[in-house]
Amino acid sequence: MKVLLTNDDGIYAPGIFAMAKEIASRDEFEAVVVAPDREQSATGHAITVHKPLRVNNVKKLGEKLEIPFYSVNGTPSDCVKLAVESVMDEKPDLVISGINRGANLGTDVLYSGTVSGAMEAAILNIKSIAVSLVDYDYEDYSTAASYTAYIANIIKDNPEEFENGTLLNVNVPAVEANQLKGVKITRQGFRQYENIFEKRFDPRGKAYYWMAGKVIEDTSDIKTDVASVKENYVSVTPIKYDLTDYNLYNSLSNWEFDD
């Protein structure tokens, strides 16, 4: 199975290296890494249209795992597009985006470069996994990498259940493997932010702002990604790029408009 790895934390981030190490250690996978040359967190599904994209072979990383590592001066979506269309000799069977430093739960998926890298694969009709470790400071990515490889094998062995374009958003609690309760299939929960903009002034007296605030989560529904990771379950949420509100669509379809 040909696997393309990308992320939004940048090619030198420990999460993507741990993921690449896990995939490279398994005979059933053939991996290529194409990732941003710097951090691209919270870039959403942005693509680069006002400057050329450049690809560099990062040999010092590739030699460690004996797989190709390429950096791109663009976003995660750029990386996937460019890898599929120009860098790789063949279209990948699976794209894995991550392992992200920090959760991608609830509405995070709308801002996340990690999820957008996987979503770009879905748009290109490729199966994909977005994987995140639910802590910014936890340094052990090995458990998240192992669970992701396990899920990748399920996708590989059950092609009839996973159509091209399937996207699984995986969030792994930041605990030791023996503390995890298992894997739970979930839906997107409620997680957003209380936005606070801290106003400051530069030496010339001009105002500027830092965005701060805190996370607001609803953990009352145990079937959601937000609640499941709190209970130390690995959350797997199938998502797609079709944002149509079908209930409202059916209602509006009965409207009559004047010509």
UniProtKB/Swiss-Prot annotation:
One of its GO terms (molecular function) is nucleotide binding. Gene3D superfamilies: Survival protein SurE-like phosphatase/nucleotidase. Its main location: cytoplasm. Its EC number is 3.1.3.5. A divalent metal cation binds at residues 8-9, 41, 100. Binds 1 divalent metal cation per subunit. GO terms for cellular component: cytoplasm. InterPro entries: SurE (IPR030048), SurE-like_Pase/nucleotidase (IPR002828), SurE-like_sf (IPR036523). Keywords: Cytoplasm, Hydrolase, Metal-binding, Nucleotide-binding. It catalyses: a ribonucleoside 5'-phosphate + H2O = a ribonucleoside + phosphate. Its cofactor is a divalent metal cation. Nucleotidase that shows phosphatase activity on nucleoside 5'-monophosphates. PANTHER family: 5'-NUCLEOTIDASE SURE, 5'_3'-NUCLEOTIDASE SURE. This is 5'-nucleotidase SurE. It comes from Natranaerobius thermophilus (strain ATCC BAA-1301 / DSM 18059 / JW/NM-WN-LF). The lineage of its organism: Bacteria, Bacillati, Bacillota, Clostridia, Natranaerobiales. The gene is surE.
